């Protein structure tokens, strides 16, 4: 059997990629939405209105237990989007690898294999970029829009109107914007729904909008002379100590299906979230995995 079929296997590609990523931290999306896998492509999730705890009713001894209504829930079903893409191993590389195998020169063999494995891990990097983009789209808008290779699909997680707000003043205008007041108002709204925001997700450009606003300087340094500025450390300290928010900066870009560079998290948008997991990135089974489970792999 040709060397390529012995060496270029899914297990070896995974091992090669894992070694490359050994010292790379998890992305914000991977931390907030850890991965898990299920059988099939049907995703069911429960949407409820849990929020404020309702105190238990008092009762006398030796009386019937009063029954509480369960919270209103909706069971939603979605068909998972399916993505696949391949990359050819060039005929020249295959031929060269087979020739080198006869020489027993492992150093030269490893050089060619490294080129092939790097091509394969490009696909993995592309898949991870797609996942991160979808996670950040959910965080920033509550929706996922897919328009790729003839496939059009929208997934709406049903954010209520009261869960989003738009400032009356553009944060990019430092003369009139008051982002800290807007954030405080949003925190009050979230708290009234029975939740406590513990972190704020935004990109560096939006962070600069907040930092550079004149109203921010006045709030953090009320006695500072005209023209004073607020440092990044001072703003982070204020958000942490005064508003109880941990800063989660999400920067970076990816190339979308139209070949355009796009930011993972949009400018001028912030999202208030609790600490810890926000949900899961659920993977269904691919046709190839399904065949392997059924013993029909070819």
Residue ranges of predicted features:
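N-terminal alpha-helical "arm" segments
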Residues: 1-44
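Assembly/oligomerization interface modules of large self-assembling protein complexes
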Residues: 33-102
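Sequence/fold signature of self-assembling virion shell proteins
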Residues: 217-298
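Ordered core of a single globular domain
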Residues: 181-229, 233-238
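Short acidic (Asp/Glu) and glycine-rich catalytic loops that position anionic groups and cofactors
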Residues: 162-164, 215-216
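Charged, low-complexity intrinsically disordered segments
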Residues: 51-53, 66, 141, 155-156, ...
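Short secondary-structure junctions and interdomain/linker hinges
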Residues: 20-27, 130, 134-137, 190-197, ...
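Long, contiguous amphipathic alpha-helices that act as assembly "spine/axial" helices in icosahedral shell
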Residues: 84-160, 178, 182, 188-205
């Amino acid at each position: 059997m040709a060397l390529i079929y012995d060496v270029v296997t899914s297990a070896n590609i995974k091992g090669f990629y894992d070694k490359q990523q050994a010292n790379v931290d998890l992305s914000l999306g991977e931390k907030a939405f850890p991965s898990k896998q299920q059988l099939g492509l049907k995703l069911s999730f429960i949407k409820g209105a849990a929020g404020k705890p309702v105190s238990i009713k008092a009762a006398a001894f030796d009386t019937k237990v009063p029954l509480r209504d369960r919270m209103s829930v909706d069971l939603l079903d979605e068909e998972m989007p399916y993505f696949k893409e391949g990359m050819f191993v060039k005929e020249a590389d295959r031929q060269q690898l087979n020739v080198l195998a006869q020489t027993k020169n492992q150093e030269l063999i490893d050089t060619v294999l490294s080129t092939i494995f790097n091509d394969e891990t490009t696909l993995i990097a592309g898949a991870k970029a797609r996942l991160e983009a979808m996670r950040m789209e959910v965080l920033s808008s509550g929706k996922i829009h897919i328009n790729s290779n003839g496939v059009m699909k929208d997934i709406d997680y049903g954010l209520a109107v009261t869960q989003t707000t738009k400032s009356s003043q553009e944060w990019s205008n430092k003369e009139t914007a008051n982002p800290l007041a807007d954030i405080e108002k949003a925190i009050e709204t979230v708290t009234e729904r029975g939740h406590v925001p513990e972190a704020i997700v935004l990109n560096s450009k939006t962070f600069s909008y907040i930092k550079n606003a004149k109203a921010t300087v006045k709030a953090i340094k009320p006695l500072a002379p005209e023209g004073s500025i607020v440092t990044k450390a001072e703003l982070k300290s204020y958000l942490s100590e005064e508003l109880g928010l941990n800063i989660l900066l999400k920067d970076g870009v990816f190339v979308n299906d139209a070949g355009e560079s796009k930011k993972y998290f949009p400018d001028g948008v912030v999202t208030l979230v609790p600490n810890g997991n926000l949900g899961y990135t659920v993977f269904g089974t691919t046709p190839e995995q399904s065949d392997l489970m059924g013993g029909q792999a070819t």
